[in-house]
A protein has these predicted regions:
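Charged, amphipathic alpha-helical coiled-coil/dimerization segments
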Residues: 77-135
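Short, hydrophobic-biased segments on the C-terminal half of alpha helices
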Residues: 58, 76-77
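N-terminal helix-turn-helix DNA-binding core of bacterial DNA-binding proteins
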Residues: 26-68
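Amphipathic, non-transmembrane alpha-helical scaffold segments
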Residues: 18-21, 25, 65, 109, ...
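N-terminal leader segment of winged-helix/HTH proteins
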Residues: 1-35, 82-84
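Pre-recognition alpha-helix immediately N-terminal to the DNA-recognition helix
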Residues: 16, 43-47, 107
Length: 136
């Protein structure tokens, strides 16, 4: 059985979806820079804060941001030098260092996250329509 061929509308849908994602990414990068963070630093802070039950470690950040361990280590060191994170021995495994946000980072991340949620609310109708169209 052969796969169905792509139609012009399929290409347009994918192009529109990617353009919408790029719009959000550009917004996110601009917001991060407006508070003195690089986009990657913002992503790392969000990854650490959003780790939930998982212990945020350098390896965890590397995996979530799709970075090589040495790149993640450098990123974490720069965040620590900037006073945005601390490293603490993990209560469950003293060999691991758990990453924690400082109060300064918590404030920055909360402001950024609120702005991102508002932007997503704005983009939601477009994203929902695009995703719904994939099924059609």
């Amino acid at each position: 059985m052969s796969q169905p061929k792509m139609k012009d509308a399929d290409y347009a849908l994918l192009a529109n979806f990617r353009a919408t994602l790029r719009t959000f990414i550009a917004f996110s990068e601009s917001q991060a820079r407006s508070v003195g963070l690089t986009p990657q630093q913002h992503q790392a802070l969000l990854t650490i804060r959003g780790s939930g039950a998982a212990t945020a470690t350098v390896g965890y950040v590397a995996g979530r941001l799709i970075l090589k361990p040495h790149s993640a280590s450098g990123l974490i060191s720069r965040l620590e030098e900037a006073g945005l994170i601390t490293r603490e021995a993990d209560a469950a495994d003293q060999r691991r260092m758990a990453l924690k946000l400082t109060p300064q980072a918590e404030g920055l991340l909360e402001a950024l996250s609120l702005a991102h949620i508002e932007e997503l609310k704005t983009l939601k109708p477009l994203l929902v329509n695009l995703v719904d169209d994939f099924g059609g």
